[in-house]
Amino acid sequence: MKILISGGAGYIGSHTLRQFLKTNHEICVLDNLSKGSKIAIDDLQNIREFKFFEQDLSDFEGVKALFEREKFDAVVHFAASIEVFESMQNPLKYYMNNTINTTNLIQTCIQTGVSKFIFSSTAATYGEPTTPVVSENSPLAPINPYGRSKLMSEEVLRDANMAHPEFKYCILRYFNVAGACMDYKLGQRYPKATLLIKVAAECAAGKRDKLFIFGDDYDTKDGTCIRDFIHVDDISSAHLAVLDYLENNESNIFNVGYGHGFSVKEVIDAMKRVSGVDFKVELAPRRAGDPSVLISDASRIRNLTSWQPKFDDLDLICKSAFDWEKQC
């Protein structure tokens, strides 16, 4: 199978690319390198060579010409803007990059005969859940433009599939992705990251002066937000599992998480424990768009696909992130 990975130079995209390169599929990557890493792309060429296209999805005609020339069988779509707080400040950027570009990509896939589409979505589509644990059937009520832009893209996929049943998709709603590749050759390189474990690892490695806790008055056990943190290698392996699933099954939506959560304070304690560094932490006001609790019910992907997570351990996730920061 010939597979295009959009956003394959990014954090999750590059880890997924690494796993796909160990298969027999022909792999190509498209990325505009606005936040992705050419270093990661060059390093991954050492596993085996693959085509890399430095291109922006907003170049609709260029993307269509690429698809007509390369004749892909499947697309794994990561390319997106992903920062919740930024989406509150600059919503149109998110609707352009996430919803409009994804819609164009879906149209191009249908026009050029792509039959399988794996979409990188988010637990932010659930908004502020009415229950601590959310399944794929839980109400969808995103509370920020990032979540809404992803949900709109999900709806485009459903409608496209209804009109074109030969075009099948799987939507993966990620929970909080964290950590680094377990051989430490890959990690998150973006210098302005806002993900909690990444920021905590940077503090422990001396790359940041302090970590801010954004609110300690949430309705949780210690007043800080609770999230379902999942190791990036387990997220990346889920894409292989759902691509295999689509061979003999219809389109579907899957939560990808571990099914239990940790608070911001618990994550900070874990990072201090594994690093041995008592870095500075300060309290700050709540950020707009942050729900208090988000925990997955991921039983569907476990029951229907071959996905078996291997790194469900907060200390292990924190240590992998810290070790990456020390050497990158």
Tell me the role of every PLM-derived stretch.
Residues 8, 36-39, 55, 79, ...:
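Glycine-centered small-residue hotspots that permit tight backbone geometry or close packing
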Residues 199, 205-328:
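C-terminal substrate-binding subdomain of Rossmann-fold SDR/epimerase-dehydratase oxidoreductases
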Residues 1-180:
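N-terminal Rossmann-like NAD(P)+-binding domain of SDR-like oxidoreductases, especially those catalyzing
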Residues 95, 143-151, 186, 190-198, ...:
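Short-chain dehydrogenase/reductase
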Residues 59, 189-193, 260, 310:
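Residue-level signature of the cytosolic catalytic core of signaling kinases
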Residues 38, 175-196, 206-227:
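Short, flexible, glycine-rich and Lys/Arg-enriched loop motifs at helix boundaries
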